[in-house]
Swiss-Prot record:
Organism from which the protein derives: Cereibacter sphaeroides (strain ATCC 17023 / DSM 158 / JCM 6121 / CCUG 31486 / LMG 2827 / NBRC 12203 / NCIMB 8253 / ATH 2.4.1.)
Function in brief: Produces ATP from ADP in the presence of a proton gradient across the membrane. The alpha chain is a regulatory subunit.
Protein name stated in the entry: ATP synthase subunit alpha 2
Record-linked Pfam families: ATP-synt_ab (PF00006), ATP-synt_ab_C (PF00306)
GO molecular function, one term: ATP binding
Keyword hit for Isomerase: no
Membrane topology: Peripheral membrane protein
Upper lineage: Bacteria, Pseudomonadati, Pseudomonadota, Alphaproteobacteria, Rhodobacterales
Gene that encodes it: atpA2
Length: 497
């Protein structure tokens, strides 16, 4: 009998059965206020651990005190009160990840908000994960093409970069990010849009825009609206980043938009004050910089040894009265790899996108730009900045010098070229053709009001030119014959009805 394989297997299974006592650590709610619970009696609790209340509601351990634990509620509708039993789960908070999230609208825990069946995850990842180390990263050298001429030509965003979009309320910050998502409809980049504390109607508009433009199937929407509990709003960017990291860690490419981190900082302050943490500048707790640094550092371009995937971040921040030197904006600017600043004055002047050329910058820039675009975009920013300065001084008197008048006229054309309606992306070949024509003076006699029609007509003309097929597929070099063909296309587009 001792040699019976079935008996040996049974013995092995019996040996794995734990025979000792099962120990559960429980506590009780001491106080409950505004989505934060103070629990007594969980001495072994860990930061980030999930606890379960009587009735099934869950919470997240945020702070540890000598006698109590502060827990953020993740189920705001739960019926809880003083004395309710709380149990440790021993597990850190995790979220579902996988292809099943594509084209779905979920809350930060991965629960559907779109009325469709539950997500079937391929795995689960903890919401707090370490950022890739230095040796695990690669240089940011591939572009994320947004389809916006002002961004792709002047402030190029690379795969693995963190480019902050910052400006006053209602100046087109979300529109910039949504345009970048829409332009990925036919690319290999998976997009994640994270709504933190936004109005439900605003989130619905974003979702419908992405759906109408054909990018919905490759986008994941993680929504924690203003009506969600503070705990859900707090975990939203971390949970969505873990979902996006699953794509990156398998060699894929992801783009994540945080809309917005100013509201995330506000909910962090709210929870910290409820937990009686010492307030610092503007009543934010002392770890506010670390909060966003550890979040944004998770966006990276991985080395080939680690799969070569990338996670690009477009965090959004709101400022008041144009004050870029406020606490949260300066924190985010110092963490990110550059910023795109939207201007209320430009927005009021009907300039779309309302990007302030002088205050915006990309610390990666040309390193991640297509070679052909880099070749023709070199002087555009300088010329436009000089035009804005001369335009300001021209209010005090006319310019008699013909050369100065020509520079003013050129600057006006640059501004008209950079103007772009929402969700009308321009391909890289079209951008190269426009900037090459500008550099050659081929647009100097085009009336400003006709430039919008020219941009719309140029795409089909380029697509119909068979000689530009290789360039359309890989616009990395601008050979003389290619430049000539592009200029010929611009001339044909000018003549188009």
């Amino acid at each position: 009998m001792s040699g019976d394989p079935g008996l040996e297997a049974l013995k092995a299974r019996v040996a794995e059965v734990p025979l000792g006592p099962e120990i559960e650590e429980t506590g009780r709610i001491a106080t409950l206020a505004d989505g934060l619970v103070e629990v007594e009696g969980l001495p072994g609790a860990r930061l980030g651990e999930v606890v379960r209340f009587a009735g099934g509601a869950e919470g997240l351990v945020l702070t540890l005190d000598p006698e109590t634990v502060q827990v953020a509620l993740l189920d705001p509708g739960a019926a809880l009160g003083s004395g309710t039993e709380v149990r440790r789960t021993g597990q850190l908070l995790s979220v579902p990840v996988g292809q099943g999230l594509l084209g779905r609208v979920v809350d930060p825990l991965g629960r559907p908000l779109d009325g469709l069946p539950a997500i079937l995850p391929e795995a689960r990842l903890e919401i707090e994960r370490p950022a890739p180390g230095i040796v695990d990263r690669d240089m940011v050298a591939e572009p994320v093409e947004t389809g916006l001429l002002v961004v792709d030509a002047l402030f190029a965003v690379g795969r693995g970069q963190r480019e902050l979009i910052i400006g006053e309320r209602a100046t087109g910050k979300t529109s910039l990010a949504v345009d970048a998502i829409v332009n990925q409809a036919a690319s290999d980049i998976v997009c994640f849009y994270v709504a933190i504390g936004q109005r439900t109607t605003a989130v619905r508009r974003v979702i419908e825009t992405v759906r109408e433009k054909g990018a919905f199937a490759r986008t994941v929407f993680v929504v924690a609206p203003a009506t969600a509990s503070p705990g859900l709003r707090w975990i939203a960017p971390f949970a969505a980043t873990s979902m996006a990291e699953w794509v990156r860690d398998r060699g894929g490419h992801a783009l994540i938009v945080y809309d917005d981190l100013t509201k995330h900082a506000a909910v962090h302050r709210e929870l910290a004050l409820l937990a009686r943490q010492p307030p610092g500048r503007e009543a934010y707790p002392g770890d506010i910089f670390y909060l966003h640094a550890r979040l944004l550092e998770r966006s990276a371009k991985l080395s080939a040894v680690n799969g070569g995937g990338s996670l690009t971040a477009l965090p959004i921040a709101e400022i008041e009265a144009g004050n870029l030197s406020a606490y949260i904006p300066t924190n985010l600017i110092s963490i990110a790899d550059g910023q795109i600043v939207t201007s209320a004055a430009l927005f009021a002047a009907n300039q779309r996108p309302a990007v302030d050329i002088g205050l915006s910058v990309s610390r990666v820039g040309g390193k991640a730009q297509r070679g052909a675009l880099k070749a023709v975009a070199g002087r555009v920013r300088l010329d436009y900045a000089q035009y804005l300065e001369m335009k300001m001084f021209s209010r005090f008197g006319g310019f008699g010098d013909a050369a100065l008048r020509a520079r003013l006229a050129r600057g006006e054309r640059i501004g008209a070229l950079l103007a772009q309606p929402r969700t009308t992306p321009l391909s890289t070949p079209v951008q190269v053709a426009l900037l090459a024509a500008l550099a050659e003076g081929a647009l100097d006699d085009v009336p400003l009001e006709d430039l919008a029609r020219l941009k719309a007509a140029l795409g089909p003309v380029l697509a119909a030119d068979a000689s530009l097929g290789p360039f359309r597929a890989a616009p990395d070099r601008l050979e003389p014959e290619t430049r000539a063909a592009l200029l010929a296309c611009v001339r044909r587009a000018r003549e188009a009805p």
